[in-house]
């Protein structure tokens, strides 16, 4: 048998030539124990707080507790396939998500993975979920209105671009409906408004039923509002770490628009469930519990999230991120731990009441307890002119109505006040999915505060409003256009508006 050494060495050299020389070095650790979505890992000595780690099978986790002899890792996914002794790898990256316009119209989970079955998202940029909020110098005071399309809010509790306005109330009082209507109200601007006025919307669903989220997405899709919205969903069946992370992920997506000179709105629905998820994680990580068993830094959890909503200065592109966090109360108790925390962080609250809801006053806004700490600087001049008196009149009405229950012989002035108040309360009612443009709201409230409703039966106020709007949209279009462009009611506009309402009132009678 003839062995040719030269030929064998040539073959070996040829084989070795294509052999990859780079060896991947990664720091690894071992799972000591796992359960309830928490893994204790030995090793990983140089891991950073908040760093992503990888378990076998591609499951991700985040290092939260860095202790002397082990690392506490929360698992983003099911811990069923992770067992003691498994190898855990560092990724070297702090938790980040895809951001950018490519996400518009999509439904994603807390890590930015699509869950709507519409294929992958080819985002060109990624951003860390937990970044520092802008400081004092890069900010500017809130001065542009963020129109919700709801009369009760835009007239009495105005929200500005860059503000944080809390929506608080018991379950089933219409909290989500306010956010939904606000998102739907942006459609008109997106269809034919200038780019600088467009408001991109992010909706974060935390711990909700999947059917509820699906319904929300369906409404947006049917009404053409999904194209400018991003939905981040961490539903009730998702692990607690995902529910904790979802608001931060949504915020990072909203910040992309804020930092690029655009305007965005983010609704967190709701932060009570995020606090519960964070409490669960903290207790399992054996962090010491505080009031109501929440960890000591639950205030910081919400403050660092909500401080990221801001109106940036002109040097920074004048973008904004407006936040509408939702908090669910138990039995109208606003003095519980989480509600008081979030009330103190935000720039005002819209307080919804079960009693008002069942009386048919919807949106069920308690005007007395609701405030906006930005106030009239977030309104156009026309709205300030008409809505200035309505808040005072309603406050007097509520006070008088309480006394009027006891006495029957009321003087004429009190009677007039009660009549006007009842009609204004009726005027502020609004069905769902029917947001109004600002100039239409101005016209309707103008009719209310100038006594056009005083002679009508309360039951006809809604009909009068509906008819007046139809009339103005067809016959009085010029007046509405003037209010929209001038953003104020001059004496000339006032006379024209009065004339239009007078001519409609004659035909209505």
From Swiss-Prot:
Keywords: ATP synthesis, ATP-binding, Cell inner membrane, Cell membrane, CF(1), Hydrogen ion transport, Ion transport, Membrane, Nucleotide-binding, Translocase, Transport. InterPro entries: ATP_synth_asu-like_sf, ATP_synth_asu_C, ATP_synth_asu_C_sf, ATP_synth_F1_a_nt-bd_dom, ATP_synth_F1_asu, ATPase_a/bsu_AS, ATPase_F1/V1/A1_a/bsu_N, ATPase_F1/V1/A1_a/bsu_N_sf. It is a peripheral membrane protein. CDD domains: ATP-synt_F1_alpha_C, ATP-synt_F1_alpha_N, F1-ATPase_alpha_CD. ATP binds at residues 169-176. GO terms for cellular component: plasma membrane; proton-transporting ATP synthase complex. Its main location: membrane. Its EC number is 7.1.2.2. It comes from the Bacteria. PROSITE patterns: ATPASE_ALPHA_BETA. One of its GO terms (molecular function) is ATP binding. Gene3D superfamilies: 2.40.30.20, ATP synthase alpha/beta chain, C-terminal domain, P-loop containing nucleotide triphosphate hydrolases. HAMAP family: ATP_synth_alpha_bact. F-type ATPases have 2 components, CF(1) - the catalytic core - and CF(0) - the membrane proton channel. CF(1) has five subunits: alpha(3), beta(3), gamma(1), delta(1), epsilon(1). CF(0) has three main subunits: a(1), b(2) and c(9-12). The alpha and beta chains form an alternating ring which encloses part of the gamma chain. CF(1) is attached to CF(0) by a central stalk formed by the gamma and epsilon chains, while a peripheral stalk is formed by the delta and b chains. Belongs to the ATPase alpha/beta chains family. This is ATP synthase subunit alpha.
